[in-house]
């Protein structure tokens, strides 16, 4: 049986935004629990409060079964077909960045008086500054983080001292927290770092020298809690790797 992780703060953020006429957008790093929040915790809240399941319309755009619906010419007519009466409908749309022309589509749904739209979005297309401009004031962001220590303890079987050691070692990514062995946790973290987080940074910022970026991240990760001096880092890269990276470039990459 999969343990339930409590995300009460974020659930409350969605609940208090119901019916506000805006597009509720859950953002955050990959694997921090956005899909679970929307399609499990929030959906259960709706059902427990009397919402008919037929009035909860779900779509996970990352599933292969739904790949055709990434085309707005397929998805939008399908979405309208789900609206059968004047009662309120809740649209819970997961990984909506995979939907082509998602801004126009979401605005179209939000324009309907009996539609309440909630979505999750990952990667480069859903930074806070982009939401403010792309949605023209109609996007209402709920930014989600990995598990806090109290959330971590909601699914940890041991005492708080052992829990703290586990938490500061492996962090609060739910998938990692629920892994059973240290080896599984390390493999998951390594895969997330290499295949997901690095990939997003490189794609969004069109970085050509990926190896240099990875080296910088290794240096920063080894000095957490210490002051960062871009000029010293630049000299280190020059002496160790004979790199031509500038202090200005290092500053920009830290800001990524």
Stretches found by the model and what they are:
Residues 125-141, 155-157:
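Short regulatory helix/loop adjacent to the ATP-binding pocket of P-loop NTPases
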Residues 116-122, 143, 152:
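Structural recognition of the conserved hydrophobic beta-strand(s) that form the central parallel beta-sheet
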Residues 57-87:
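Short glycine-rich substrate-engagement loop in P-loop NTPases that contacts/grips substrate
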Residues 1-15, 19:
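N-terminal pre-Walker A segment at the start of P-loop NTPase domains
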Residues 26:
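Hydrophobic anchor at the beta1->P-loop junction of P-loop NTPases
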Residues 84-102:
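Conserved P-loop NTPase "ATPase switch" module shared by AAA+ and STAND
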Residues 35:
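Walker A/P-loop
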Residues 4, 150-256:
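Interdomain hinge/linker elements that couple catalytic modules in large macromolecular machines
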């Amino acid at each position: 049986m999969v343990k339930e992780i409590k995300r009460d703060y974020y659930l409350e953020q969605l609940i208090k935004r119901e019916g506000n006429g805006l597009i509720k957008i859950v953002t955050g790093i990959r694997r921090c629990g956005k899909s679970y929040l929307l399609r499990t915790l929030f959906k259960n809240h709706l059902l427990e409060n009397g919402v008919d399941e037929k009035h909860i319309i779900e779509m996970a755009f990352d599933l292969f079964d739904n790949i055709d619906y990434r085309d707005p010419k397929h998805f939008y007519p399908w979405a309208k077909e789900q609206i059968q009466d004047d009662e309120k409908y809740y649209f819970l749309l997961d990984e909506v960045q995979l939907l082509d022309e998602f801004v126009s589509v979401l605005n179209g749904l939000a324009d309907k008086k009996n539609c309440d739209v909630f979505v999750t979005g990952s990667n480069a297309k859903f930074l806070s500054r982009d939401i403010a401009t792309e949605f023209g004031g109609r996007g209402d962001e709920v930014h989600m983080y990995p598990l806090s220590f109290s959330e971590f303890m909601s699914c940890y079987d041991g005492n708080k001292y052992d829990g703290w050691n586990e938490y500061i070692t492996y962090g609060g990514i739910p998938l990692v927290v629920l892994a059973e062995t240290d080896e599984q946790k390390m493999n998951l973290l390594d895969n997330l770092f290499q295949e997901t987080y690095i990939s997003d940074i490189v794609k969004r910022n069109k970085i050509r020298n990926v190896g240099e970026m990875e080296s910088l991240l290794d240096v920063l990760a080894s000095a957490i809690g210490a002051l960062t001096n871009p000029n010293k880092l630049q000299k280190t890269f020059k002496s160790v790797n004979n790199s031509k990276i500038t202090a200005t470039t290092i500053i920009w990459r830290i800001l990524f």
